[in-house]
Amino acid sequence: PGTRPLLSGLYRLCGPVRFALRHYLCADGVIYCEEDLLLLSGLQHFAFCRRQWALIHLEQQWEENLRTVEGSLLHSRAHDASLRERRGDLLMLRSLPVVSYGLGLSGQCDVVEFRASPQGVSLRGEEGLWLPYPVEYKRGRPKAHQADELQLCAQAMCLEEMLCCPIPEGALYYGEPRRRTAVSFSQELRQEVRSITEEMHQFYRRGYTPKAKPSKSCNACSLKDLCLPQLVKKRPVSDYLSQAMEDLS
């Protein structure tokens, strides 16, 4: 589906002038067309495993396991309340659609908190200035890799492009510790987001599914039975036949 109807809520909240400026904030002058937009949520899959991303987003393969079900339940709780909630100097928007034509991504933020700040932006129907603070909900504990941080940073970069304001920080909420982990959106993290999204678009244009590279992470992947990484460790039949012919000669 197109992003225009999805983004109408944020358009009404922030006003047409600022919203239209997003086209001029795209990194390196690159602007993707709407039909070229990829799912923002796929960035986390891609950073974790290129093959997992391709199986899901190119080949439309998906299997549930305990981890994916727990993750879906956690996200449903984050999206369960009213889409807009006010708590003093804190305005919370849930399931907020976002887009970046510079990154070529569209998707949803679990929660975006708008905090009263002189560095913020004006919001229609609200007094003062408000600084966005994205919060992404994840199952389990903080991970050794940066896939979650990259997804959150991409959300912030979408919001920056749409609202024309800098967003220095956000947070990941993990289900097991039940607390937030602050994430600083450094230049290094932002550049990694740009590099990965560019690679995603290259894979998508080529329709390319990488070969499996077995690792410890494969055991927890819901797609392991579809991906079959264990086959990579086995010797191809052609190798056996070639060796047998050599032995007979």
PLM regions with names:
Residues 10-134, 234, 246-249:
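Metal-dependent nuclease catalytic cores that hydrolyze phosphodiester bonds in DNA/RNA
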Residues 78-81, 175-186, 244-249:
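Short, mixed-charge aromatic SLiMs
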Residues 46, 57, 77, 192, ...:
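Residues that form generic nucleotide/phosphate-binding pockets
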Residues 49, 209-248:
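Cysteine-cluster motifs in flexible loop/terminal segments that predominantly coordinate metals
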